């Protein structure tokens, strides 16, 4: 069985992006005309940190999944968690 391959991250002013190349035996599990939820892409074996969204299908190469998430997503999540922790009674 082939391995799932992950690109390096790349960026624009709003998002960070990455693409994931699926081996043929995994790619055949993809639905043809819709994007996958996080639970669905995790179920087929894609492993990434939180916040990534399957945002587009590149029709000529449907075995390549395109993902994006807002810039600084992880820092925003950490800041929100720290703020919530400060609100807990001591």
Curated annotation (Swiss-Prot):
Q: Name one GO biological process term.
A: regulation of mitotic cell cycle
Q: Which UniProt keywords apply?
A: Cell cycle, Cell division
Identify one Gene Ontology CC term for this UniProt entry: SCF ubiquitin ligase complex
Entry superkingdom: Eukaryota
Entry-linked Pfam families: CKS (PF01111)
Q: Which PROSITE patterns has this protein been placed in? A: CKS_1
Q: What induces it?
A: By auxin.
| Gene Ontology MF term list | cyclin-dependent protein serine/threonine kinase activator activity; histone binding; protein kinase binding; ubiquitin binding
PANTHER family referenced in this protein's UniProt entry, alphabetically: CYCLIN-DEPENDENT KINASES REGULATORY SUBUNIT/60S RIBOSOME SUBUNIT BIOGENESIS PROTEIN NIP7 (PTHR23415)
**Family as reported in the entry's similarity comment:** Belongs to the CKS family.
Query: What's the stated role of this polypeptide?
Result: Binds to the catalytic subunit of the cyclin dependent kinases and is essential for their biological function.
Its recorded name reads Cyclin-dependent kinases regulatory subunit 1
Q: Which organism is it from?
A: Oryza sativa subsp. japonica
